[in-house]
């Protein structure tokens, strides 16, 4: 694997499992770049993904948050399906569903301001993190790349294959929305849909 010879890529083995958010936080802590990109270990990116993100940043240095479209990929990586074509940033839609999900990149400055992923939201830790980052960035500094650059791998234990495989994620997602409303001063009670 050529990535092992690239000094910018760091591989570390944790002494224990810190949970979904905790493990990601350990990776963020050792990062040295100006941007953080959230990426699940079993998913894949198009070869030009990072190029497209960096090109956008070079052309628009005020951008703080970037996300792309995505699709799903089968377990052996041979079939792509269920493309998810996302809209440009829409806070009202985000308050009803985590449509951003993958691939998400945020400036390290924003991360330093909003803090790391919160393990209290494990299962929807990315949803809570996306809310906090977009709140801080402001809609004018959020950009959507309308290309399926991220491929979410489906397997029996994944929420891509079976959203009900991790019911705790629904509860955590509800709490993430409520936390967002609380932070921005909107008096609301979030309930799960029926």
Q: What residue spans do the PLM features occupy?
A:
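Conserved donor NDP-sugar-binding/catalytic core segment of glycosyltransferases
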Residues: 48-80, 155
């Amino acid at each position: 694997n050529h990535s092992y010879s690239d000094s910018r890529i760091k591989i570390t083995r944790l002494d224990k499992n810190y949970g979904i958010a905790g493990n990601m936080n350990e990776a963020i802590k050792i990062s040295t770049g100006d941007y953080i990109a959230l990426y699940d270990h079993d998913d894949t990116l198009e070869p030009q993904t990072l190029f497209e993100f960096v090109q956008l940043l070079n052309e628009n240095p005020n951008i703080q948050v970037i996300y792309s479209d995505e699709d799903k990929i089968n377990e052996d990586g041979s079939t792509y399906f269920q493309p998810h074509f996302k809209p440009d940033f829409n806070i009202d839609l985000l308050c009803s569903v985590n449509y951003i999900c993958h691939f998400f990149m945020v400036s390290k400055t924003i991360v330093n301001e909003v803090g790391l992923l919160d393990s209290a939201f494990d299962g929807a830790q990315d949803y809570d993190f996306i809310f906090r980052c977009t709140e801080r960035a402001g809609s004018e500094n959020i950009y959507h790349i309308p290309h399926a650059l991220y491929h979410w791998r489906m397997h029996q234990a994944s929420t891509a294959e079976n959203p009900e495989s991790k019911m705790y994620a629904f509860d955590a997602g509800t709490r993430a929305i409520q936390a967002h409303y609380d932070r921005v001063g909107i008096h609301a009670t979030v309930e799960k849909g029926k």
